Amino acid sequence: MIADPAAISEHTIDLHAENFKNTRYDGRRFSLSNDTVTALERIVCSIQFIYGARDALPHSELADRANLVERLHPHSEFVVVPDAGHWVQYEAAADVNRLLLAFMTASA
């Protein structure tokens, strides 16, 4: 989840435990199925994908995911944040916020 084990604190563990406890959605089932592609095919607006370069969870290579996005949504944005893991928005909050604001401003 977190790329740098030194960044894991009691707060991080508590946050993950609370999120896990409140989850009502099985993301593993969705990410391992063709439902992801089907859902992406139905989206008609631009999409921004933000991944951490050190995310150990994708079930395919980031390059494969980027190619899929390019094929399905050539005008969308696929960004890989260096030195971040699956919790890219937690580990690289300033970078993710900057990317989101730039994307939303350009899309407005």
Language model: regions and residue ranges:
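Conserved alpha/beta-hydrolase catalytic His-Asp/Glu region
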Residues: M1-C45
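Phosphate/oxyanion-binding loops and surfaces in catalytic or ligand/nucleic-acid-binding neighborhoods
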Residues: M1-P5, N19, I50, A56, ...
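Non-catalytic, surface-exposed connector residues within folded enzymatic/regulatory domains
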Residues: A6-E10, H59, Y90
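Generic structural signal for small/hydrophobic residues in well-ordered secondary structure
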Residues: H16, L40, F49-G52, F78, ...
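Residues at alpha-helix caps and immediate loop-helix transition turns in enzyme cores, especially N-
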Residues: R28, L32, S60-D64, A92
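Conserved loop-alpha-helix segment in the C-terminal half of the alpha/beta-hydrolase fold
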Residues: Q48-A84
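Catalytic active-site module of serine/aspartate enzymes centered on a nucleophile-bearing elbow/loop
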Residues: H73-A108
